[in-house]
Amino acid sequence: MARWIPTKRQKYGVAIYNYNASQDVELSLQIGDTVHILEMYEGWYRGYTLQNKSKKGIFPETYIHLKEATVEDLGQHETVIPGELPLVQELTSTLREWAVIWRKLYVNNKLTLFRQLQQMTYSLIEWRSQILSGTLPKDELAELKKKVTAKIDHGNRMLGLDLVVRDDNGNILDPDETSTIALFKAHEVASKRIEEKIQEEKSILQNLDLRGQSIFSTIHTYGLYVNFKNFVCNIGEDAELFMALYDPDQSTFISENYLIRWGSNGMPKEIEKLNNLQAVFTDLSSMDLIRPRVSLVCQIVRVGHMELKEGKKHTCGLRRPFGVAVMDITDIIHGKVDDEEKQHFIPFQQIAMETYIRQRQLIMSPLITSHVIGENEPLTSVLNKVIAAKEVNHKGQGLWVSLKLLPGDLTQVQKNFSHLVDRSTAIARKMGFPEIILPGDVRNDIYVTLIHGEFDKGKKKTPKNVEVTMSVHDEEGKLLEKAIHPGAGYEGISEYKSVVYYQVKQPCWYETVKVSIAIEEVTRCHIRFTFRHRSSQETRDKSERAFGVAFVKLMNPDGTTLQDGRHDLVVYKGDNKKMEDAKFYLTLPGTKMEMEEKELQASKNLVTFTPSKDSTKDSFQIATLICSTKLTQNVDLLGLLNWRSNSQNIKHNLKKLMEVDGGEIVKFLQDTLDALFNIMMEMSDSETYDFLVFDALVFIISLIGDIKFQHFNPVLETYIYKHFSATLAYVKLSKVLNFYVANADDSSKTELLFAALKALKYLFRFIIQSRVLYLRFYGQSKDGDEFNNSIRQLFLAFNMLMDRPLEEAVKIKGAALKYLPSIINDVKLVFDPVELSVLFCKFIQSIPDNQLVRQKLNCMTKIVESTLFRQSECREVLLPLLTDQLSGQLDDNSNKPDHEASSQLLSNILEVLDRKDVGATAVHIQLIMERLLRRINRTVIGMNRQSPHIGSFVACMIALLQQMDDSHYSHYISTFKTRQDIIDFLMETFIMFKDLIGKNVYAKDWMVMNMTQNRVFLRAINQFAEVLTRFFMDQASFELQLWNNYFHLAVAFLTHESLQLETFSQAKRNKIVKKYGDMRKEIGFRIRDMWYNLGPHKIKFIPSMVGPILEVTLTPEVELRKATIPIFFDMMQCEFNFSGNGNFHMFENELITKLDQEVEGGRGDEQYKVLLEKLLLEHCRKHKYLSSSGEVFALLVSSLLENLLDYRTIIMQDESKENRMSCTVNVLNFYKEKKREDIYIRYLYKLRDLHRDCENYTEAAYTLLLHAELLQWSDKPCVPHLLQKDSYYVYTQQELKEKLYQEIISYFDKGKMWEKAIKLSKELAETYESKVFDYEGLGNLLKKRASFYENIIKAMRPQPEYFAVGYYGQGFPSFLRNKIFIYRGKEYERREDFSLRLLTQFPNAEKMTSTTPPGEDIKSSPKQYMQCFTVKPVMSLPPSYKDKPVPEQILNYYRANEVQQFRYSRPFRKGEKDPDNEFATMWIERTTYTTAYTFPGILKWFEVKQISTEEISPLENAIETMELTNERISNCVQQHAWDRSLSVHPLSMLLSGIVDPAVMGGFSNYEKAFFTEKYLQEHPEDQEKVELLKRLIALQMPLLTEGIRIHGEKLTEQLKPLHERLSSCFRELKEKVEKHYGVITLPPNLTERKQSRTGSIVLPYIMSSTLRRLSITSVTSSVVSTSSNSSDNAPSRPGSDGSILEPLLERRASSGARVEDLSLREENSENRISKFKRKDWSLSKSQVIAEKAPEPDLMSPTRKAQRPKSLQLMDNRLSPFHGSSPPQSTPLSPPPLTPKATRTLSSPSLQTDGIAATPVPPPPPPKSKPYEGSQRNSTELAPPLPVRREAKAPPPPPPKARKSGIPTSEPGSQ
């Protein structure tokens, strides 16, 4: 037999399809699940998913993609570590975590966050794929890593997940390998970085002006990206477009041009540039970004003929001005607009012509045509006019571009925006240097601008069309190829031809080009300008020769470069070839300035070649701007560099160096420094230059400290270590420095000294490097100890300086403290580190106390940051000083201590001591512990939790505690001199720890920091616990408060939110457990041990420690619970033994109180309840004396927990207020039994609030009444627990009770329970009248009571219906299961609405269609079955109302209120069926339900506590029916007699239903069934009942007579036929009845109308028993023959409704002997009339007045038009899910009433003591819980486990079309 083989290589994989397990042995997989594979066998793997390691199973091999992994501890306990990059693993786990949250966001409809997360997730997935591809270069991978980590961190913050701390390379920090301080700083940095990123994104989203924002403060260089889309303009010739940035306020161009050559065909000249015309204008500084206005301008130059329409014979290739296009881009530059996709239209303005027609005659010849005049205006002039104009008439012509501002220099832009900027992108540089000059940026650009000229027209009648040709030549006259660049985007050209203006004497060009030549060529080169007239005729143009030449040299004779600015050039004319001979004309002056100088010298050259008069008339002006990193225009700098050739000017040049522009100096940094040190060394004889060179060096170092030149720091460093070679410079430099410091009191030297101190770091680098070079060449022996002495001397000078009074040289002192530590790392290379440490100690000590405190602390911080402090022997010297200074600071109570600087210093010390490479640290830790631990603690205790420094101090404390080992702890305790000192320290520490645990110093998302704190605290707590046990355990030394604080601290730690693993995601939980374990268990076990160690002291902690221990036991960790729950038994036992009372009441009360608080706060679960009960019972049963009382208590607590858990579940999860009420009452019940009034009252008010929210004012009143009943009408003070938080401010019980009564009366009034309100107001009135004598209050109360009386009679008060609801099946919770409840419906609520409301609470419940009690099969079913039907309340009238004519409005209250019994009747058949008269065998089964409490009460439902059933015989049923009918007729007649305004329709329907045999039939059934000899022979005992029935039939006649009479009086035309029919039928009926059953007359007093005192009619309700008693029978007896002689062919009906059973019998003729069930579906319109007959068959015969609910349908307007046969008067009791219309009642039309017959019940009577006499009611059924529902087939047994078949093949993977799809058919899952 084959077997499973352990895998060797296949250890780790990912599911690539979903797999649904079909057997228990299989493991379900979802796509993406990672699996650890343990074994394999024939195409199957066995293992588990890494998300749930506890469940192992098998799964098909083909569903898994294997991945590389490292296996640790191979074998039974092996673990797999994926072999992917750590970043990929982080990405994977992040995506898994986000995916879960992403789904939740969608479910919770948080769509904005959902979409944000979706985009971030897509980005991460894409980047993960790129990383996994392995194709990225190293630098791109590093860049992508930054993007990935930034995105993860941002997403985590957005989702409220934990902050991930990383090192500089983006790798996650391991807290075990990182110091606490470094960890804290990393959290701060990460938090700040994410916050800045979020703010940056917000700013972009909100389109904020980003100037001044952090993004601009960190970036100094920008670029503007321009993407040229199209140029729409009808030129007809080629064109050149010059785009540049322009400042309209200063009328200057900011950048060089970007050139686009546009063809005459409307496309780029180079077709490859189509859709690829883009440029970046670089080097923009932050100053450029805040210019008030910036424009993007485009100048268009036409290249072709002089005139547009000229033909072939005309000259072509001329550059002619055409127009401009301008766009204001200020918003884009300022960052307000940022959309690289948006295309901007820049309107084109052609040069205007009309404006020049006027001027033509004045300045031009009349021969000129007008169309070219406008073209002579300079483009820059047009440009400014367009900018000034509000709008341009562009006629649809213009440019289309898109723009984007890019932060960073060119290199950064190419890296960060590679999708925009590539190799083909043109780079247009700024005409000037960027804000920050980079050392590697070699640039040699000379910008030349042709400004204007003036040329004599000579022999021509019109001015010339001058074209300037510009070229670059060397001194030999040789042309430099491609040296001129008209614009970026194209290579250089050799000659540049200017724009030609037509016949203009003084043309203005303003054309700028860039001359770019090699630096070494600059000294030899010059620029030549040739002037030529261009003719529009091609033949003439060819013959035109250059008429003039001008030139300018790029270097001045003194070696400086041509100065920036304007230059007036001399235009030389002549026809000889000397004009082209550079050797010749270079001897001439190039500029007017040179000429003036030469004229003074009267040179010989001027004699041989003197310009003619014409040449002096011509002028030409240019402007130059040089942007060169290698050329200087500064004479002084050049003089310094060439100092040897002009040594007499050294002093002058050194002084002038300070005035040279920094940009010039950094260009020649190395040369300048070489010159300085050469001067110092070569001129060593004289000290004259030493100070000047020193000052110059300081100036240069300071210059490089400027932000503009900060990137030259590496250049300076490189110079010092690679090029600097002055071996003796240290002597001179240190001498000068010493002199300056020693003479600090010389005010003339103050600024020089201050500058020197700022440059101290680099000064000393020069000094030390010089000394190193010296030692390398000469060794130590030459100068003895001279150098060391100079260092000592320097420190001595500093010490003297620091010791001077503060007001003197405070600036210098501050600078010394700030900059002196910067020399440490260099000096220690050539100076003894220990001595250096001593020197620094003396330096610090020389500063007077309380002076420059912050500067001093910062100085010490820098000392600690230096490498000096990392040497153990140096620390021996420095640390005592540092701890002294710190302890002085932290102890300083008089002045405000500098917490920021102190924490910085302390954290740096501790961070160094935590390093592995700094030697032994134990002694140093001990020193810090002894001197600073207590001070740190006290600082933390005294510091505000909102202080910005609290986090740093706590980190220092954690770091120190972490670095202390066990011996440190022991030693520290031994340093305390007295026992009290130890107590004080422990007290402080415990209180501080507890405070820090309770109020988190660090943000919740600083998970690593918080867990590090927890781990350190746990160790410290355990260490201090040992101290407690050692010093404070025995009877003499026991410290109660200390132990108490320990326990409370330990519990606070254990219950801290950061340790509650259950609340975290699985991923986070695994992370924490793997790194830190479950710390709760460790501290929990320690708490247990410490408790048991207390011995006889335990009693001192009862009951105070019950709550904390309860918190521990409630922690959802099974082992911890098992370990700590027995402490409860120990407490019980302890109190039982030591209290002297032989009980544990203190413990019991405290546990109940705390349990209530904790469970309500969300703690505890079902498992806890079971475990608590089990463990307590186990321990109690073993105890000799606690076995019985302990067992009772254990069960009691278990019961309480069950109620509280139910309550919490409903409150937290169920939206149904009813279910919340139910659980609240359950808890109330418990606390009432336990006499815990404090908690009881608290829950009363919770219930009150729930009722108030639901507008259940009656129930709210009854709830408050329970509180009022606990109070007395006395002046006893109110104990606190009797008052609630929202209660009134009162002092005595009487005051509180009065306030409560007023509120209760108000609620009763709102709930229309005026009878109850009257009762309470009487009690309150008595108090007002005879106790407190508040007559004013009494008057108001009586007025209110009067209104209640009035409301009872006049106000409409609908009666609620009552419903019985049975919950059957095991699917319901235990407190509902197989129980019946009676519900009080809301106003106008029908049964259909009610049942629907219930079913929404229990969606899984199945409606039962039967009203029969279900069988055992239903009750034991795992499903939920619900039975719902209407029941009728049994009225219980007060004795004072019996046998009295009580008004209907008063009785109505008792019909539906103050009831506790309810009835439901169901017909069934008994005996043999009589085909002629089924009525004789139809019986009624009447069920009476008695509830636990009277309605209304504190709930709208109560459980049925007793059910009794009786059977009503057909004869008794007939009697009841007749009595009810007679009551209805009587009262309907009375109402119509007394109130003529009532509608006659209900009376018509009632009468026709009784007297018209065609509608209802007659009483033939009664006659057939009961009025026969046979019946009386068989039932002689019924003789009296038969007589009674006959009398009731006879009694109906006088009532009908009165009814017919009133009907006739209120007759309308429409009703006449009906009335005639009624009268006819009634005459026949009356004649027959009087003949057989006698004549009965009613006394007149029954129909008298009584006036109330106010004149209103009081309508008495007359019962059928009263009618019988008071009626007079004139025919004493009637004999009814057995032959049913009253049938008269048509059956006659004896009652208002006839028999209830008649319709049933007609429909059920074929049914069996007993009707077992009346289905809900059988009720239809035919049996609705039986409602009249089903109204509560069950009234006691002893009652004179019985309860009957009004029948609303008789008066409802919706029923008026219906035929009598379909009267909607049926009782709901036979139709559980079809209710009647709600009852209605108005003062003007009281509803017709049908009292119940008097009949004795067979059921036992129930007590109805009212709410005060009964316990608090149990809960109503709450909504079912999800887990309590079950499927229909859940009763089936689970199928047996599959047997492994050897040959079973694994299922094939699903088709690969969609990996995410779930396979529809899988062999493996069948």
Curated annotation (Swiss-Prot):
Residues 1231-1642 form the DOCKER domain. It is found in: Cytoplasm; Cell membrane; Cell projection, Podosome. Keywords: Acetylation, Cell junction, Cell membrane, Cell projection, Cytoplasm, Guanine-nucleotide releasing factor, Membrane, Phosphoprotein, SH3 domain. GO terms for cellular component: anchoring junction; cell projection; cytoplasm; cytosol; plasma membrane; podosome. Residues 1679-1702, 1772-1870 are annotated as: Disordered. Its main location: cytoplasm. InterPro entries: ARM-type_fold, C2_DOCK-type_domain, C2_domain_sf, DHR2_DOCK5, DOCK, DOCK1_5_SH3, DOCK_C_lobe_A, DOCK_C_lobe_C. It comes from the Eukaryota. The modification Phosphothreonine is found at T1794, T1814. One of its GO terms (biological process) is bone remodeling. GO terms for molecular function: GTPase activator activity; guanyl-nucleotide exchange factor activity; small GTPase binding. Residues 8-69 form the SH3 domain. Residues 443-627 form the C2 DOCK-type domain. The keyword rRNA-binding does not apply. The modification Phosphoserine is found at S365, S1756, S1766, S1785, S1789, S1834, S1869. SUPFAM superfamilies: ARM repeat, SH3-domain. The keyword Cell membrane applies. Gene3D superfamilies: 1.20.58.740, 1.25.40.410, C2 domain, Dedicator of cytokinesis N-terminal subdomain, SH3 Domains. The DOCKER domain may mediate some GEF activity. This is Dedicator of cytokinesis protein 5. It comes from Homo sapiens (Human).
